[in-house]
Curated annotation (Swiss-Prot):
Name used for this protein in its record: Poly-cysteine and histidine-tailed protein
Entry comment on modification after translation: Glycosylated.
Residues of the signal peptide: 1-17
One GO MF term attached to the UniProt entry: zinc ion binding
C-alpha cells in the first residue's frame, strides 16, 4: 500500500539528501524542479512519475516485490498516504549525494484506507517498507551511503494498520486508525527527545535466538525482558544450526533516547555480515529439509510474528510500544530457500540463492544501476563515488524521499509484522 511503495520509490528516485561523509564541502543544489501531482498506486505508476519528474535515468520493474492476494484491488487515494514530491540536483562529488528532494502529504486524501489482508502476515503491510529498506543492509554499501539512506528513510511517512472486520484499516504518517477503524486521527505529540548518536557496530550475531538477544541487549545496554515479548526458539525439533552463512549473520548499531511515555527508547540499524567478516558468512546455507520441505523458514517467520502480535494484543500493549518492539524485531534475518536435491539452499534478504543453489546473489530489486545493466561506471571516478552513485537503485528505485515537512522521530514506529523467515 501507500507507505510501502513510498519506500520502494524514493530509494532511488529522490533518496539522496545532504552530505553524509567527511567531505569538507558539497556543491550547492540547483533550483527546485516542479512539484508532481499527488502520487498514488500502483507502485510502478508512482516510480515512473517520480523518476520522470526528477530526471533520473533507468527503468525498473517494481510489480513483483510482494505477491498480492487474489482479486486485490487498489483503493482510491486515502489515509494521508498520497503525496507529491519535487527534486533538485547538484554536481557530483565524492561523499555528497547528487539529489535532494522534499515531499508534501496530500491531506485532502485523508479517508481511512480499507485494504485486504496479506496471506500469512495479515495487516502487516509495512513489510514492504522493511523489505526495501533492508536492501541497504548489504555489507558492500559504503558507510556514508548507509547513513544517508537511513536518515532519509526516517523521513518517510510510516503506515499504521489495524485489523477490523477481517480487513485492514490503515493511515500514514502522523495519523493512525481510530479504534472503530472508521477514520484517521492525528496522533498525540509526545515531544520525544532526539535519539543519541549511534554506537559502534556489534559483532556478527548468530543463532540460537536466545543467545542472539542476550548479545543485542548487552550491546545496546538494554536491561530486563521486553514485557514478555522476548522471542523464543521457533526451530523444528532436532534442527541443526549451521555455521554463519547466507548473509544471515548480521551486525547491529543502536541508538537510545530518554525514556518517556509515548516514546520508544531504542532503535537499531542492521548490516549483513559477508565474506570479509567471516569465512562462511557469504556462502549459501545448506540445510536439511523439514517434513520433506524447504518452506520451514517461512513458517518459522510467520509463527514468530503471529506470536508477537498475539502477545501484544493479549497484554493490551500501547501502539507506540508495540510498534517500537516490532521495529526492533524486524532485524531478525528472513530468508529464501531453494530445494536442490535432498537439501535446502538458503540465503537471507537482500540475497537469494542463484539458479543452481550454489551461491547467494542480490535480489533483482535491490541491485544497483550497474548491476542491472542500466549504467556504466566511469573508469576515472573515485571508488567511493562509484559505489555511492550505484546504490540508489539498490533500494530499488523505490521510494526514498527527503521529507522536509517531516514527522520527526514520533512516538510511533511502523509495525512491520512480517514474514521474516529466519534460520535458527
Amino acid at each position: 500500500m501507500a507507505f510501502s511503495t513510498i519506500v520502494v520509490l524514493f530509494v532511488a528516485a529522490v533518496g539522496f539528501g545532504n552530505k553524509i561523509s567527511s567531505a569538507d564541502t558539497c556543491p550547492e543544489f540547483g533550483e527546485w524542479k516542479p512539484w508532481t501531482e499527488c502520487l498514488w498506486y500502483p507502485m510502478q505508476n508512482i516510480y515512473d512519475k517520480m523518476t520522470a519528474s526528477c530526471g533520473l535515468p533507468g527503468h525498473r520493474n517494481l510489480t513483483n516485490i510482494l505477491p498480492l492476494p487474489p482479486g486485490f484491488t487498489i483503493p482510491p487515494p486515502c489515509g494521508h498516504c498520497s503525496f507529491k514530491t519535487r527534486c533538485r540536483t547538484r554536481p557530483k562529488k565524492e561523499g555528497c549525494y547528487p539529489f535532494d528532494g522534499e515531499r508534501e502529504i496530500c491531506h485532502e486524501h485523508g479517508d481511512i484506507c480499507t485494504i485486504a489482508k496479506l496471506p500469512g502476515i495479515g495487516c502487516g503491510w509495512t513489510v514492504l517498507q522493511e523489505v526495501v529498506k533492508q536492501c541497504l543492509s548489504r555489507p558492500d554499501i559504503p558507510e556514508y551511503m548507509r547513513a544517508g539512506y537511513k536518515k532519509l528513510f526516517h523521513m518517510l511517512p510510516k503506515g499504521h494498520c489495524i485489523e477490523k472486520d477481517n480487513q485492514c484499516k490503515c493511515c500514514c504518517g502522523d495519523y493512525e486508525p481510530n479504534e472503530d477503524g472508521t477514520e484517521c486521527v492525528k496522533q498525540q505529540d509526545h515531544q520525544c527527545a532526539p535519539f543519541n548518536e549511534p554506537g559502534d557496530w556489534s559483532e556478527c550475531l548468530w543463532f540460537p535466538l536466545a543467545d542472539m538477544f542476550k548479545k543485542v541487549q548487552s550491546h545496546c545496554g538494554v536491561e530486563g525482558k521486553p514485557e514478555g515479548l522476548s522471542p523464543s526458539s521457533l526451530a523444528p525439533a532436532g534442527f541443526q544450526i549451521p555455521e554463519k552463512c547466507g548473509f544471515c549473520s548480521f551486525r547491529l548499531k543502536c541508538q537510545s533516547r530518554e525514556k518517556k511515555e509515548g516514546c520508544f527508547p531504542l532503535k537499531v540499524d542492521k548490516k549483513s555480515c559477508g565474506a570479509e567478516d567471516c569465512p562462511t558468512c557469504g556462502d549459501v546455507c545448506t540445510l536439511d529439509k523439514q517434513n520433506n520441505s524447504c518452506a520451514f523458514t517461512k513458517a518459522m517467520g510467520m509463527k514468530f510474528w503471529n506470536s508477537f502480535a498475539h502477545k501484544a494484543k493479549e497484554s493490551n500493549l500501547a501502539h507506540w510500544r508495540r510498534d517500537g518492539y516490532a521495529d526492533l524485531f524486524k532485524f531478525l534475518p528472513y530468508g529464501h530457500c531453494k530445494e536442490v536435491g535432498d537439501k535446502c539452499k538458503c540465503c537471507c534478504h537482500p540475497y537469494e540463492p542463484n539458479e543452481d543453489g550454489t551461491a547467494c546473489v542480490v535480489k533483482q530489486y535491490c541491485k544497483s544501476l550497474e548491476e542491472v545493466g542500466g549504467k556504466k561506471q566511469q573508469k576515472d571516478q573515485p571508488e567511493s563515488e562509484k559505489k555511492a552513485e550505484n546504490m540508489p537503485e539498490t533500494t530499488g528505485n523505490a521510494s526514498h524521499h527527503q521529507h522536509r515537512h517531516h514527522h520527526g522521530d514520533s512516538s510511533s514506529e511502523s509495525h512491520e509484522q512480517h514474514h521474516h523467515h529466519h534460520h535458527h
